Amino acid sequence: MSYYETIASRTEPKKQLPWVEKYRPQEIDHIISNRDIILSLKKFIESRTLPHLLFFGPSGSGKTSTIKCCAREIYGKYINYMILELNASNERGIETVRTKIKNFVSSKSSIFLPMGVRDIFKLVILDEIDSMTVEAQGMLRQTIEKNSGTTRFCLICNDIDKINIALQSRCASFRFSPLNELDMHGRLSDICRLEGVKYEKEAINSIIKISKGDMRSAINTLQHVNLVIGGSINTEDVYKISGHCMPEIVTDVFDILFSLNKNKTKSLKKSVNDIITIVTENNITIFNLLEELKNIVMESKFTTSQKIFLIDNFAKTEMYDSVNVDSNNILMILACLFVFVNNV
């Protein structure tokens, strides 16, 4: 069954589902990214040699969808009896391993399941395991070792460096990359067609740009903009409603910063006021402004040492924003950074 036939055949009230769930792949062949990983997993499933798995990579790259599709492939309609899914960011302590996981792996399969299904290993899916405490990871390693004969574990995280090395060594690790723009464009265009969303071509490109390979973020943004606008979506709608900066506006801010000179005190004050006006009128957050400025700085004519100085101090400026320093003061700090760089 094709991806779109699967979506059409689902029986739940689809209009009430968030699009990110409504259009989540249901079969392993429906996943559009990381094809090398998909091929490897299909071979494991076909040969019944699925190892413990560790999926890592950025958000929205298909990690959770992939293992759920694998589970459907293995268990079919009995999936709810054979898997335990936990989010480790909510249940990050050692008690989770002691109780929920141990109880699941030690329990016998339901007598109502067919013999062929009862003989298959169970599956524990642990999402966001990089949020788990060190102690909990240590106990999880022991649980995996003791129950390898009856249970497989799939550990999912964004940051593999936060995972116990001993735990990593017991799993087949797969790095998920952000989705490429072509795949994202195709899926978003198809969703627009199925939902009757009218849009300008550049609007989809803008969603892809601000999502940075995160398919979940892209679909959520598309649905959000569509709900607010209700008509044909354009690029300005996407940036305004998602809270991101229009490229032209960020370029205007950068041009002001690039021209700053520490010897022109009046010019500095006026320039900062101009930037404050732009940021306020366009409802731009400091975080998003800095994110876009990073990209422009990296493509600019600044020397390598100047770029390093600015990017390093952008990170410190983001910290000020995170502790609620007044945004006008942050913009003054930002201007002073460029004054310094322009006169080094």
UniProtKB/Swiss-Prot annotation:
Ligand binding (ATP): 57-64
Swiss-Prot/TrEMBL keywords: ATP-binding, DNA replication, Nucleotide-binding
Single Gene Ontology BP annotation: DNA repair
InterPro entries in alphabetical order: AAA+_ATPase (IPR003593), ATPase_AAA_core (IPR003959), DNA_Rep/Repair_Clamp_Loader (IPR050238), P-loop_NTPase (IPR027417), RFC_lid (IPR047854)
Any one GO molecular-function label of the UniProt entry: DNA clamp loader activity
One Pfam family from the record: AAA
Described function: Part of the RFC clamp loader complex which loads the PCNA sliding clamp onto DNA.
UniProt similarity note: Belongs to the activator 1 small subunits family. RfcS subfamily.
Protein name: Putative replication factor C small subunit L499
Organism: Acanthamoeba polyphaga mimivirus (APMV)
